[in-house]
Amino acid sequence: MCSLPMARYYIIKDAHQKALYTRNGQLLLGDPDSDNYSPEKVCILPNRGLDRSKVPIFLGMQGGSCCLACVKTREGPLLQLEDVNIEDLYKGGEQTTRFTFFQRSLGSAFRLEAAACPGWFLCGPAEPQQPVQLTKESEPSTHTEFYFEMSR
């Protein structure tokens, strides 16, 4: 678990109450009751090196031992979990933009925009048990809106 006092843990759900979880190195979205898994307790820390008005955050999984990253490929931006400790990112020990997401408020919901790929947002899959992706979507939808439920 992350030892920094400002670390906050959340269970992140979509509009249909499906929660984020990790399995086999992938970030998935599903129903904990029917999919037989435990929701991921996502550790969130701010990225102090970017404009605070955009609410830049790091998303740490598995107790903060790996983080969600946006990687540029020929096919477009790709989400992946990387073995990078969230505390190291917070302390500024590595290039951090690809691990940063801007938390955009929509009332009680949020959209998560990849700092490394402006205009690309975290998006829940259309099919169950598929990886969470990035989409270039200008308007909010139920696939790009997420709710943060405090955990611990």
Swiss-Prot record:
Record bears the keyword Cytoplasm: yes
Intracellular or extracellular location(s): Cytoplasm; Endoplasmic reticulum-Golgi intermediate compartment; Secreted
Protein name as catalogued: Interleukin-1 family member 10
Organism superkingdom: Eukaryota
Subunit structure of this chain's protein: Interacts with cargo receptor TMED10; the interaction mediates the translocation from the cytoplasm into the ERGIC (endoplasmic reticulum-Golgi intermediate compartment) and thereby secretion.
Major localization listed first in the record, in broad terms: cytoplasm
Function: Cytokine with immunomodulatory activity. Alone, does not induce cytokine production, but reduces IL22 and IL17A production by T-cells in response to heat-killed Candida albicans. Reduces IL36G-induced production of IL8 by peripheral blood mononuclear cells. Increases IL6 production by dendritic cells stimulated by bacterial lipopolysaccharides (LPS). Ligand for IL-36R/IL1RL2.
Pfam family, any one: IL1
CC per GO annotation: endoplasmic reticulum-Golgi intermediate compartment; extracellular space
GO biological process, alphabetically ordered: immune response; inflammatory response
Keywords for the protein's UniProt record, in alphabetical order: Cytokine, Cytoplasm, Secreted
InterPro entries: IL-1_fam, IL-1RA/IL-36, IL1/FGF
Species of origin: Mus musculus
GO molecular function, one term: cytokine activity
Family: Belongs to the IL-1 family.
Gene3D superfamilies: 2.80.10.50
